[in-house]
Amino acid sequence: MYTKMAGCRYVVLLAALFGCTQAMSSVVITGTRVIYPAEKREVTVKINNEGIKPVLVQSWIDQGDMASTPSNSSAPFVITPPVSRIDPGKGQSMRVMFTGAALPADKESVFWLNVLEIPAKVVGNEDDNILQMAFRSRIKVFFRPANLSGTAAEAIEKLQWKLITKTSGQFALEAHNPTAFHVSQSNLALIAGSSRVASEAGMIGPGATQLFGLPDLKLLPTGAVEVEFSAINDYGALVPIRLPLKL
């Protein structure tokens, strides 16, 4: 993607930092998350160039900082190759290796895999005033220690939900995760009779308690109340869940 811009010479813009999505990128990561079992020496991540031009790809893992770069990230992983050229219609397998740093043994740890795509320079273009766009995709990496109690699939239904009133007077869903696994979810809503009140969704870490606001709920419901959401499993699939809710 190229745009005329006076006074600029091949400026690389990290468009992902400003809300651009993976769908805008030619490079597609196979899968929406990486599960790294602690007993494995390495795991493999496949990326594909679905565009019509060659691209240069740089990959690294961070600890959740969107502003991270390969030079300042302290995540305990090494990626091989860290930089590669991928031709149109081709793919690249990346080896992700844990360096052995001290991490909790009783719960998962979460990191982020970054894949930065830089399009090839236009050949034969005499105009130096070109803004060259680079796209960054990020997916979660879950480092999973051996011998954790339970499974990631079981953790989904073990979430403990409450409907609470915040000090501001607004209602919210409170979710407590008593397990050793992260639970990611979307399409979160409160179900009261025939009414459905949507809420923001997100990830709930091991042992964590998180609030999800219900700005459209004005009165405390009566009768049976449930919480509904789509949990995201290890394969990136959405699992529909409906659980009873404590008032």
Residue positions per predicted region:
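Short, hydrophobic/aromatic beta-strand segments
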Residues: 53-61, 182-188, 241
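Asparagine-centered strand-capping/turn motif at beta-strand->loop junctions
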Residues: 47-51, 173-179
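Intrinsically disordered, low-complexity Pro/Gly/Ser/Thr-rich segments with frequent PxxP/GP/PP motifs
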Residues: 69-101, 194-221
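Terminal connector regions
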Residues: 99-148, 220-247
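N-terminal targeting signals for Sec/Tat export/insertion, comprising classic cleavable signal peptides
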Residues: 32-70
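Short, solvent-exposed loop/turn segments enriched in Ser/Thr/Gly
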Residues: 38-44, 106-110, 169-171, 225
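Beta-sheet-dominated interaction scaffolds and their linkers
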Residues: 25-48, 151-168
